[in-house]
Structures are given as C-alpha cells and as structure tokens.
Amino acid sequence: MSLSPTQFRKAMGCFATGVTIITLDLDGEVHGMTANAFASVSLDPMLVLVCVDQSARTHDHLHAKKRFGINILGEHQRVISEYYARPVRAHEHAEEEAGARFDRTAQGTPILNGALAYLECRLKSAEDAGDHTIFIAEVEDVVVREGEPLLFFQGKYRQLGEDAPE
C-alpha cells in the first residue's frame, strides 16, 4: 500500500489543535503567520516548538530575527487566523480590517491584542525536517488571559463543546 499526502493530511486532521499566530518585528512592521504545529517541549528550561514550511515567508525571518511571539488565539479570533494564513496579504490596512491590533513587549516583539495567551520566545535551535523546519525556542515571558480557545479539526475552525463523558 502506498501512502498518499492526501491520506496523511486527512489522518493528521483528526488531531485537534489550537491555533496560533507567530509574530515578529521586521523593521518596525508586524510580520505574522498562522500556525497550528506548535507544542510545549520542556518545563526546565521552558521550551516550545513551532514547525514552519520552508517556503513560507516567515521561515527565513525566524532564522534571522531569533526573537518572536507565539499568540494563542481565542475563539473570537477566527478572522485574524484566516488573514494570517494567507500567503499574500490583500492590502496595506487589511490586518486592521481583520481585527488584528498589536502592542509591543519591552524587546519590541509584537503581541496580538485579545489573544488567549502570548509567549515571547528566543530561538535556540532549528532543525530541517522534510519540507518544514522545527524551530525550538526558549520562552522568556508569558501573558495568559481568560477565555476559550480557537480550535482546528478536520480542516475547519471549531470551538470547545461540552466536557467529554467520564
């Protein structure tokens, strides 16, 4: 039996994930991309990973800048996720129309207003893995807010439902 990329993608779609936007500063401008291949790696030291397609515009910027934010989206931020998932932005003020507004950390890293949580990260290592790169970063600061997460499952955005039966 030969496994197709479509079958693999369908199987991976059965794993529900949260949705993040990776943000970084490029000469005073916010650059970002939607990512759901994100995970905690270690508590001591506090490490996370994010996987980025090597053809994505953000890929080379992460290598060069070394400092970035991971914004964990709330259920009300689907439009923002869709905007940052596009490979090409519509026009200069489209991010504001999508509802994306940013503050800055003391180090200048963009923080998405209203995100459920935010992690400020410094790149520790990068490992090529197929057509993606696994970026491992040390978490230097976090902000956590109340709310429900935006989820992604079987190719669609979702919200939390009821608790699973015991």
Enumerate the language-model features and the residues they cover.
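Basic, polyanion-binding surface patches
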Residues: 1-166
